[in-house]
Amino acid sequence: MVSFLSLKKATLTGALLLIFLTCCGGIALLAQITSGAIFGEVRDQSGAYISKATVTITSPAIGVTRTVVTGDRGDFIAPNLLPGTYTVSAEASGFRKVEKTNVILSAADRLDAGVFVLQVGAATQSVTVTADAGELQLQSNSGERSDLISGKQLNDVALNGRMVLDYMRLIPGVVSDFDGSASTTYGIGAFNVNGTRANTHEYTIDGSSNVDTGDNATTHVTINPDAIAEMKVLTSNYQAEFGKAGGGQVAVVSKSGSNEFHGNVRFFHRNEGMNANNWFADQANAATPGSVPIALYRYNYIGYQVGGPIKKNKAYFFWGQEYYRQLIPTGGLDQFRTPTALERVGDFSQTPFTIYNPATGLPFPGNKIDPSTLNAAQRNVFDNVSKLLSLYSLPNLTPASATDSNFATQLSYSDPRREDILRLDYQINERNRFFGRWVNNAEQSTSPMQTWNLNCMGQLQLPGGCVNNAPSWNLALDLVTTITPTLLNEVSVGPSVTRSSWGGTNGNLSIGKNGISLPMLYPVPPSTSIPDMGFNGNNLPYPWSYFGANPWFQANTTIDFNDNVTWVKNNHALKFGLFYQRSRKDQIAWGNSNGQYTIDNCATSSDPVGCTDNNSGMAYASALLGYFRSFDQSSSRPIGYFRYNQLEFYGQDTWKITPRLTLDYGMRFAWIPPQYDAKNQIALFNPALYDAATAVKIDADGNIIPNSGNLLDGIGYSKNGTLPKGGWKSRGIMPEPRLGFAYELTQDHKTVLRGGFGTSHDREQGNLVFNTVFQNPINVVTP
């Protein structure tokens, strides 16, 4: 039988386990993925193990030195090393020293440096060999399936833009149609890794989470390829130290300074002059093919960076900036049947559809609506709809038939961005090393209205467009302490922040600016966006619009905390770790407080009841006369204050059973309670609360009969305790077993067999919870 802990009980249990782990922190390891480990063996010429040999791992570039001693079987492990290029040397009394150079360690890697064969001789004599990079890339100390994109590949592999996530398409098991040509925060949700859902991945920069907790598909910040040392993607069979998400694990490591100064300056340019026009755009105007110009497609990227020592072997810095000036096509040809200049004022004399007067059932004389014949209320609607229709672009095509488009365009939006990155590394003393890294993004995009965008959607093109301000930053702070040569502690903190605000410019979307005052169910201020109009009928490609979500904003802050220790005991690397994340997400609802009208041609056609005549009437005429098919308006736009706490911990052992066989086994525990609203605004339909005796009655057309019952029958609320705080119960602490192995089939370290098994849990995207506040309670809960 499976039982779920209540939220309250799970909280208490989690707290007790946190205290236990803190007290027993002597056997824990780094749970994040910025560090790696180097394994190896030391033997003599006869193949016998050499115990108590001294192994020294150094990185002259960043002044790192680590010394370990071999165990009874001549093996050694050096954990918690920063990614980089190392020199590994082994020495013992009575033997020549052996030194292996160019040992490249990657993030989250368990690198086998191979066997160090010591020859009898004086300690002052040494043998130096260069590591085989190809051989070292074989993963023989873990069952994980992962792929590394090294710094060299980052430089050598051409991209369609500057999006580092575009490299994921090179990895086996990753499927995506991601277009990484533009620099944008969209992308992590565009990949399926080994069949997992696209929004179930974790993406970290130097161990700090970089995923928006609303859709789990966008990132807080971007970082350009020149600022990255390497990128690693774990696709399956990863160890218990990796969690938070059920899909792939993407780990990006930023560049750091070194004992030498390095830098670069770069410029990238792209122009639509090298592109062919859209074939459909060439054919859009039958009278003059090719008259619809190509969309502007221009990239001008300028960047620079510099890194070096503040004090050699002690402190280093890395600083870089990249400026993006982008004009990005909105996505193909946009064409529709826009109202002509005459139609906007009620003159349909040039329109190939007969317009009927709904009051008389007869055609209007000359196919013209005379506004002077309307009463005051009708005239008010006529004048306001006329103003709204005048906001659409005028025709620029000659339609080939009555039902063809008379307007076509290809638009681009402006998206200037700036990336800043600063990293500081500091060797405090022999036992403590610290680094801090800050990435800052500044962005303000301006979109034309005639585009599919987050909040300015549709085919009204107003001066100034729609503007999105999106500042964001991501920080990583990390301290590694060497307690003993085999016992290390690492603590890290990673806050990440993003803000977004959408809206028009200078009131261009507002009813006040445009002088529109159509009837509303609920009063609205002059700053409210213009009403949305949905036109239908005549088999015409009518334009549409949606501005009800303006102005819109969201603010997402996550804070990660990790405290981990590594303990190496003979041929075991025992690992236990702790991960905690706090998320805040403040977001205003989408909505239609501006009012949404739907209009068709029926009222002004020859058959207003059956609406069988598509060759008469027109939606524009029906709107001018105030014949709306439906109207919908929200009374308010609530703001959600969504929060969650997430705690995960694990125990794991990497056991080098034989020189050729490694076993990974461990258990991770995840406490992932649902997001909740801090104002207790969540409402859901709960079948347990439904009373059939008080249910509303429905007529033959499916409409609710007024005053026939309780409209809120079955609705539960987190505010009054009829629902759990997050809408549904927490599943408590969930176990996630992990098992993996790696076996070298041959002694030449050229063929490795790996396998593994594991379970993971994932937090559902926040939007599923947000809708319980933003929408009418149509969602169903099964507590």
Give short role names for the model-derived ranges.
Residues 264-417, 442-462, 497:
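Periplasmic-side early beta-strands and strand-to-turn transitions of outer-membrane beta-barrels
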Residues 193, 252, 304-308, 422-426, ...:
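Residues on the lipid-exposed face of transmembrane beta-strands in outer-membrane beta-barrel proteins
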